[in-house]
Amino acid sequence: MENISPALLEWFYKNRRSLPFREDPTPYHVWLSEVMLQQTRVSAVLPYYYRFLEELPDIPALAACEEERLHKLWEGLGYYSRVRNLQKAAKLVCAQYGGQLPADYAALRALPGIGEYTAGAIASISFGLPVPAVDGNVLRVFSRLYNDPGVITEPAVKKAFTARVMEHQPPEKAGDYNQALMELGALVCVPNGAPLCGQCPLAEVCLARAAGTTAQLPQKAKPKPRKIVPVTLALVESPAGFLVQQRPQKGLLAGLWQPVLWEGEHLLQAEVLARLAALGLDTGTAAPAALPAAKHIFTHIEWLMSGVQLHVPVQSAPAGYVWASREQLRTTYTLPGAFRAYKPLLL
């Protein structure tokens, strides 16, 4: 196949979106944007990106930020392990590299939370290094370009595709080339069997288009079935606020805050009241109101939630819990998106 970079770059320079991390592609800006964009659309990321940089404009500020504030700045983006790894890496960068990301692919790759793709994006876009940056968009483009039925989630297939990506990369324009492939996958060679081939600068050399197989590519492994977990919530409110507790520092939703809940079972109202009493809580005489059922899908787990809302008298919080006002829930305590259906009741 002829080299695709001239046609690809010509298209990119005419059609690329104006994005803040492209207009000012410092290593920190590219790093932050790539981490935020994992599992999240550009349009959803931009408000968070601006807000995050306004408060944490550089790597030393990120390294010094208190964890609770860091979670609050990330609230709504989900996948909070991303921002925890971001801070771990920032602390190492401050300790080892004077607060500046190293201009070296292997050194970037060694930092917490920075995988092959993110390291490649930083190294090529910010430092101009001729390295690959292969994400799902790029894999989809090359799967169709070469009409390759390989399962793109398999390491050997990804390695082969990466080699093909590098065959076409102009070393002096590595960053632009990598971004152009990502942009092509995001805007034209889109997923779900509906590529906009009429707008594609590579249409004339695309083997899947010639074979009529674009709708079947790329091939992906069948997803594993999610584990279904019943969850019972209790939105307990007193004049002091809502009763909340912090989740453990490791595991699902680590370090975030939640209402009273019990994972693994759906409880009747009487059972909820008995459990609250066992915590030492005076539930008063007001009858609880049933919460609407809701669900939240994690990567491999699906929560099916139900529960109650009730008002209780003024009292001390049970051990391990705190009373949080609506204002504190808005500004201080980070509630994960898993409770999105109930946030209007809490905020």
Language model features with spans:
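Catalytic cores of DNA base-excision repair glycosylases
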Residues: 2, 6-198, 202-211, 215, ...
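Intrinsically disordered, low-complexity, charged terminal extensions of DNA damage-control enzymes
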Residues: 1-18, 23, 186-347
